[in-house]
């Protein structure tokens, strides 16, 4: 459904994927790439960096990277310990380490928050987004009621204003 909506608006996106989901849904992962979107690493099991031992966290990133093979990395919950960054750079191959790009966001839709409506999520995005914004949506069970209607409305709103939606890459 998400890919259909993106296609309808000629929008490209970057999907930060959880390795375990890539393993379970290989066809979807391949379709994302085939349709011209970019992918990034979001660990293997969506570990919370500040609550996970450094060696376990690094292993999760490396395990996910074996499947995802992207220099783009977004720490789950946007948090990572300095020791984990240092260890990642040390434990990845020299080429992977040089290319590793940590990606944050400028606007989060809060689509996963069950106390919010799609309208609340939409209003949060348009209140905070502008040129060059990186907007986060979640394609997860928690976000199922908010994500699709919010994404659709955001794409309609900004497309009508002349904005385009681009994927992230190594050069961004």
Name each model feature, range by range.
Residues 16-25, 47-55, 74-82, 110-116, ...:
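Acidic-and-aromatic substrate-binding clefts and catalytic sites of carbohydrate-active enzymes
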Residues 4-13, 21-24, 143-172:
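C-terminal domain-boundary segment and adjacent tail
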Residues 1-70, 164:
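Active-site beta->alpha N-cap acidic-glycine motif
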Residues 17-20, 41-43, 75-77, 106, ...:
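A cross-domain feature marking catalytic cores of carbohydrate-active enzymes
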Residues 4, 27-34, 59, 63-66, ...:
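Alpha-helical scaffolding segments of alpha/beta enzyme cores, especially the outer helices
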Residues 79, 84-128, 162-172:
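His/Asp/Glu-enriched short active-site or ligand-binding loop at hydrolase and phosphoryl-transfer sites
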